[in-house]
Amino acid sequence: MSNVRISEIANELGYPSKEIVEKAQELGLKVKTHSNAVSLEEAEAIYEYVQTGVIPDKFKKKKSEPKAKKEPKKETEKEPAKKEEKPKTEPKKAATKAEPKPEKAKAEPKKEAQISEEKPKTEPKKEEPVKVEQKPAEAPKPKESLADVTQKRRGLVIVKKKKDYEAPAPIKEEKKAEAAVTNISDFKSMFSASDENLARKKKKEKKVTVVSKKDSAEKMDLLGGSDFGDIVLEDEDVVVLPDFSFKTPAPTPMQRTKQPNAMKTTVNNTINSFGEGGIQRRARKKHKKPENKQNSEAVTSINIPKEIRVYEFAEKLNKQPSEVIGKLFMLGMMTTKNDFLDEDAIEILADEFNVEVNIIDDQKEFDYVAAYEEEIKDDENLQPRAPVITIMGHVDHGKTSLLDYIRKSRVAAGEAGGITQHVGAYMVNKNGRNITFIDTPGHEAFTAMRARGAGVTDIVIIVVAADDGVKPQTKEAVSHAKAAGVPIIIAINKMDKESANPDLVKTGLAELDIMPTEWGGKYEFVPISAKTGMGIDDLLEIVLLQADLLELKANPKANAKATVIESSLQKGRGPVATIIVENGTLHVGDTVVAGVAYGKIRSLLDDQGRSLREIKPGECGVIVGLSEIAEAGETLIGVKTDKEAREYAQKKAEYIRQKELSKSTKVSIDELSAKIAEGELKTLPVIIKADVGGSLEALKASLEKLANDEIRVNVIHSGVGGITQSDVALASASNDCIILGFNIRPTGEIKEKAKESGVEIKTYNVIYNLIDDVKAILGGLMSPIIREEQLGQAQVRQVIHVPKVGTIAGCIVTEGTINRGAKIRLIREGVVVYEGLVSSLKRFKDDVKEVAKGYECGVGIENFNDIRENDYIESFKEVKEKATL
């Protein structure tokens, strides 16, 4: 005798698996999860206990009655009366509430053909007892099907079914029954009548019949054809058996009288095929993936990762991807099964499917930073470290000049256009103590760079020009510093100028909640001059004092943890990265991983290009030896082995690759309709190459913002390093693609190949020049702006009707001029009546080209004669202008 899973019992009763597990445990059964199995006797006891709330006596007697059940199961047709003794009550109890009189169960489709023939007459007599528990007397038959079907999990479903489905006189439709055997579509139509009766009767039995009606009906249709060779089973455990026990009788009352033996043979053969694995082999041949074994179990709570695709979400819910896609479509989102779902979409879907969702972090397996933090969280070997200072502010306010004076260098003079376009990290020694400075660009395009600088710093110095006051990037710098939660020091620069006004700076910053200490605030304002050096020593003293208050500490003996500030590709060195060490010490020969890049450090360099043996906490330097260019802002961690570093990097790379492949293609229905109506969105395909990763990131972000409803920039490829032949080939394959280079120059060979391929290469060393040129190109692709220019106006004084010519308006010009062939609009009482062209223009009897203000004329309007006195004729022309972003 085979066992039955708790999940199947829960499905048939319509209860959550968790409740059924609890009920089974109350009965003393050793079950813990929904996947545990129990014997048929125990399952029947659970059925009775759930339906009545009373523990069955037979179960209390340690299964003394199950034997009686086993015997009747063996003799299905000859001994129906015996089975009615005790098995009757248990299956029936599930259905008693819904069916006061078992005799009305004519349309019950859940009986086996042969069982229903003999049983119906005897059972009605035994149902004399008034008690609800005695009505189940009819249920014994289901147990017979249980005996036959016990080899598979659904056998238990039959326990709750009736067997008095004999009442209908099926003889009239024998011919239809025969047709049904050969024609599946006809067979389906025969189900309708009995299914309707069944539906009415089943309403009350809702909990007991939770089985998927749709699936079972469709599969029973296939059974009617008796051609099992073509059946493709989605799950051998779930599909066929429950359908035989629930749907066989209803559709074929004629079949019972005409072909009982054939039906019995078919059922037995099908059941036997399960054990032999025949159907399973057939399913493999059809390449049909089996559904989840838990398919019939209602999912109420699931754990899903932060990043999950549509088909993965469907699998978690035991649903088809098409169901999830359909729900999203109804919400106005066009998705494919490989698209990622964001948290909002997950919450909406969870509500739609009535499930509780618990979002978990799926990046733990390659989250080397979390693993590192776990190792050092109780670190006690802490020592003071050098402070990291970030200099921020508006473009051209003197940030780099300040750092140049401190370092005694001339970095600003070497920057293109006199503006910083890279993040630089420098070391300065003051009073025997090291201070690390990060110089960030002030141009608006470098927002991400400034945010990155603020994120790794201990103190922020915001430089404001005394003669210029607070500017947009000044406000942005304040926002970044506040978001990072770091102390702020204000340096009022250019105090050597006559137009310097420090109060202007203080007033502007006070509006941003940055109050100076002399005004009762908590922020230090230091007047300086990067040109003369005035106040710079005071600034450094305040920096060191602030660092002491912060008590900055790190463990120099731990594995290194650093942040990548900038990265690039250098000839002779390969991928290099500028880093700032936050904890631990980085040595030459250490194995490190930074995102998708990993490797063993071949050399360390300081900001002057000199070799180093190690970089301590709070210090900066350049590392050489990574496998590829590390992304700016990535965290770099020292690991023990090359294998560990490679695994982290490869897992992260695979994750990123999969995410790229399934980039969301979501678009609202309204947007989709608009695109179809107005034509395809115009795009400018570009390839971007830059000298360092930070500049590349800034360029991409700036160009992607250059978009509107009509046009956008499509970055088809970007990378760090020079322009290569593959870049030219890619641009050639893409229509109208241009290559944009920043701080790089193509070689003669590349220029020649680009010329042959018809590819345009543009190079720049100032970022806003590049952006302005792209704006101009986009403007040329956009539809021109049509501007209307007024030419003149005339008042109709008299209407003249000329045979074979039409109506002529006798006018006097009140403004400007009226020209022949010009566009005009006829205005009556302030409302435009008609727009057209001047077909004829005469002064007295002469045709003229134009009539000036104050003169009378006759005006004929093309294809329009409804002219009245006191109408106004307004003349204008349309001027097309180039659109700009």
Curated annotation (Swiss-Prot):
GO CC terms: cytosol
Record's keyword annotation contains Nucleotide-binding: yes
GO molecular function: GTP binding; GTPase activity; translation initiation factor activity
Major location category of this protein: cytoplasm
Region G5, residue ranges: 529-531
Keywords: Cytoplasm, GTP-binding, Initiation factor, Nucleotide-binding, Protein biosynthesis
Xref: InterPro entries: EF-G-like_DII (IPR053905), IF2_II (IPR044145), IF2_N (IPR006847), P-loop_NTPase (IPR027417), Small_GTP-bd (IPR005225), T_Tr_GTP-bd_dom (IPR000795), TF_IF2_bacterial-like (IPR000178), TIF_IF2 (IPR015760)
Chain intervals with Basic and acidic residues compositional bias: 65-146
Chain segments carrying region G2: 418-422
Family from the record: Belongs to the TRAFAC class translation factor GTPase superfamily. Classic translation factor GTPase family. IF-2 subfamily.
Free-text function comment from the UniProt entry: One of the essential components for the initiation of protein synthesis. Protects formylmethionyl-tRNA from spontaneous hydrolysis and promotes its binding to the 30S ribosomal subunits. Also involved in the hydrolysis of GTP during the formation of the 70S ribosomal complex.
Protein name per UniProt: Translation initiation factor IF-2
Source organism of this protein record: Campylobacter concisus (strain 13826)
Gene (UniProt): infB
